[in-house]
Amino acid sequence: MAQIDDFKANLIGGGARANQYRVTVTPPPGIAIGLDVRRASFLVTASQLPASTLGEIAVPFRGRNIYVSGDRPPPETWTVTFMNDTDFMIRNAMERWQNGINNFAENTGAISPADYQTDLTVEQLDRDDTILKSYIFRAAYPLTVGAIELTNAEATEIETFEVTWRYQHFEPSGVV
């Protein structure tokens, strides 16, 4: 029968903590958005490490199916929640980015994906800021800049908003 000491001996490092992470948003090369990358990283309040999914193919054989792996489906979107400061620096940057892709008023914008897509990173950290695991989201751009709720009922909370990113694929560390 397993003992508590056996369990503790197998929890190397004490377990990864959900609140120890860093998100880095790199501005796109072709659109000036005015983002302070270091400050934006501090104002992230929530994110997630991505799921990994493989497709499957059912192969019928004498009334039953066997399954073999298929292609990867298109990736899910990735969402980051930011605190909103009184200068609206991050929100303004995200709106400038979207406006550079497709202008709010004129339906014009960047043509080449190389101008508006960039790489984003999320890193799982140890309690001493050592990077335990990282994911690079390749060729990403802000798909949705979420609403900010305004209400009289929340006098003691700082505004937050979500940005949902579309990316082409992600690259996890420690896999290859």
Predicted regions and their residues:
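Glycine-rich, low-complexity intrinsically disordered segments
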Residues: 1-176
